[in-house]
Amino acid sequence: AGGEWMEAVSDERLSLREWYHIAGVYEPGTGITLYINGKSAGTYESDADFEPAESADLLIGRHSIKARPSGTLRPHATAEIYTFFDGIVDEVYIMDRAVDKAEIDDYLTEFNPGSKSVLKERKLPAGRDGYGKFGAYYTSLKYYDAWDAQWRVDDHADVVVNFDDFPGRFVFWRGTSYIPHWVTGNGIWYNNEFTETWSETGCHEPMSDKRCQSSHVRIIENNPARIVVHWRYALLDNYYKISRVDSLTGWGDWCDEVYTIYPDGVGVRSVTLYSNQPKPPAEWHEGILVMGPGQRPEDILEPEALTLANMNGDTHTFSWEHGIPSEADGDGFVHVPQEANIHLVNTKSAWKPFVIVSPESDPAWDIYSHELQPGVSIFPWWNHWPTAMNPCDGRNAQHSDRASHSSLSHCFWNAWRETPGSVTKLMLNGLTPLSAGDLVPLAKSWSFPPKLTLVKNESVENNGYDPSERAYQIALTEKPSGSGLEFLLNGDPGSPINNPCIVVRNWGDVVPDIKVDGEKDQTGKTTRFGFRNSESGVDLIVWVKKDAETEVQISIEPATGIASR
């Protein structure tokens, strides 16, 4: 009107899955009046005459020009896009005159659809609810029809790990770019980030790979004793440019993450960054919570959202109730308790996400202390990821209208292994019903594992403990004889036994008879085994549900009267 664009914006937010009647009226001398369900919700005064658009299409539910989303944090790394209305539009009327409030009220009386929702609640898909058989399976998780229809995938796009002792899951879903999530029994999603680096075009990370063009997941092992899942991705920006491309080879930064997951809800994250500059500035961990539409960070997190602990059992809990925790220094780092290496997120759930790194890796922790929006949430809150397809490097969430995420912290710790072209780091992670201080025995058993002593050592090699698998490594130089093998785990308070795994290489295709301190498990719950094919033969994987600070004897013999598997 009058050669200028005008707009009226309401302060009222529309709730999800409810019908609203929206009317916009323009009248010279009055200007714009915006009505929501018959009530004035916004105005813009103007005396100018209305000027209809010429030579332009009439669009309903879509903007006519591309623009960056409102709330964009880094415009240089965010593309301009068309914005669409996500919902149902019905009974659209365009008048050639200004209508008054009485006419709007009459219309509402005649056509009021009521409060019944015709749209289903959108929940992040995590597979079957509740307890399931421990194991991993391929599937294509369903979110909602319009979102699912965008994908060029068939029936085996995602991976879900189920547990039989608690109702949690471990999920690799394309809607999160396959970034794996621990999902609690009541549907709270948590992840430990990925590797991330930066350039003048923005963040390079799998979060940018909205279509999963380089992010892939596959099941490596799947047996009653453990699950191994391999996730591989390139470090991409939002325009699918890979970081640090070598001018000679054409290779950029790639990452392999291998997750070894056990029935007790504990997994090892072994993450290897391959690069021609393997020690550039990079992140390897961030405590991230993911929410579905209708959820806010406050719905899934306690205000006292994070507890850190050290190997002495000292703990400290950090609160966001009054803003960034006051314990954070000028750079965001926290120093209580001293030498903390255990990280527990206080989700509103019985089982909570945890992280453990070795105390010998010199860990340091910081609080995510920027991009907060006081008055919107006490926690950082963004919705440029997950499930969004547009290239966007960061967008503040203003409302819970779509899937979103929040972050609490970062861990910085030393590498477990380095080569001229790679860096590997390790962490324990999973879900637990325990407090942070009560995770110390688990941390000790992994960081300072009990010594394994062979009792029957003929044709047997003891290859020690591999923290990247949370497993002892034994190799047979000959096929197992009738006497099998026997060993001791020498647990003590400094090196306790906690649900050990034993890998017996070259065991062969023979069902084992396993005894712990002379007792055989009759339930199949406390002693589990599986097999793994390898280049050298068939390996046996044994997992024992056992906590002890004393010596434990384990024997593994070929079962009599039972055929090979």
What are these model-predicted stretches?
Residues 1-118:
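Extracellular glycan-associated modules
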Residues 201-270:
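Extended, loop-rich substrate-binding clefts of extracytoplasmic carbohydrate-active enzymes
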